[in-house]
Amino acid sequence: MRRHSTRKTVARVAVVALAVGVLAGCNTFKRLSEIGDGPAMSGVDNPTLRPDYRPVSMPMPAPMVAEPNPSSLWVPGARSFFKDQRAGEVGDLLTVIVDISNEKATFANNLSRTRGNKEGANLTSFLGFEGTLADVLPDGVDPASLTSFGSDSKHTGNGSMARSETVSMRLAAVVLQILPNGNFVIAGKQEVRVNGELRELTVTGVIRPEDIRSDNTIFWHQIAEARISYGGRGTVTDMVEPRYGQQVYDILFPF
């Protein structure tokens, strides 16, 4: 029975190791095919057809019914009598200005913990069990030691983090959805490949049409539920990231 359980444990470990190897191998083959050319840029596609796209649903105010007035040139809800060149419909473009300058964060934490515990009853007998145990144990039994125990633990930890970021870019985004209250759901993606390193900048969120400036631009801090991602892949990223084995070890190792 024990041998069967050991075989099952070994089989499970082998399956996990094989799965990790297959996943790493798939990415390895892809990276090997990019040697000399750098990471391949993705094609231009419809953002709403991406697997991670989710329509936005937010609380909305009560709708207002516009009453037509034939004798007026102005319609309730209109922003301007003349043609507005700013984004206003699904599929329109606008420029998002991302200017994250001198974003810094410093964090340090030191922890030292020591704990000791000791209990003893100093009993001369332990319900008569000391005689029975003396027949089994060659050195005899001290009743006081049966009711005394102690423990000691010590833990020391140090952690620190220093971060400095500067991102200054302009990114064209597309209006994907118009919410019932008139706000726009936008998304934009930009890829730049330089010397074998592919840098990606993505922006998604909800904006107000009133915040769009006359030159059809909007600042990143005016985007609600903003999701701004700046990263990449390539030779530089490979140098700064730990190897796959080290990442798996850090996740699975419990101590």
From Swiss-Prot:
Signal peptide positions on this chain: 1-25
- Parts of the chain that traverse the membrane: none
Q: How does it sit in the membrane?
A: Lipid-anchor
Instruction: Write down the Pfam families for this protein, in alphabetical order.
Output: FlgH
**Disulfide bond annotation, renumbered to this chain:** none
Alphabetically sorted, this entry's keywords are:
Bacterial flagellum, Cell outer membrane, Lipoprotein, Membrane, Palmitate, Signal
Which GO biological process annotations does it have?
bacterial-type flagellum-dependent cell motility
Q: Which Gene Ontology molecular-function terms are recorded?
A: cytoskeletal motor activity
Q: Which PROSITE patterns match?
A: PROKAR_LIPOPROTEIN (PS51257)
Report the protein's function. Assembles around the rod to form the L-ring and probably protects the motor/basal body from shearing forces during rotation.
Database matches in NCBIfam families: PRK00249.1-5 (NF001305)
Question: How does it associate, per the subunit comment?
Answer: The basal body constitutes a major portion of the flagellar organelle and consists of four rings (L,P,S, and M) mounted on a central rod.
Q: What is this protein called?
A: Flagellar L-ring protein
Q: Which organism is it from?
A: Rhodospirillum rubrum (strain ATCC 11170 / ATH 1.1.1 / DSM 467 / LMG 4362 / NCIMB 8255 / S1)
- Identify the gene encoding this protein: flgH
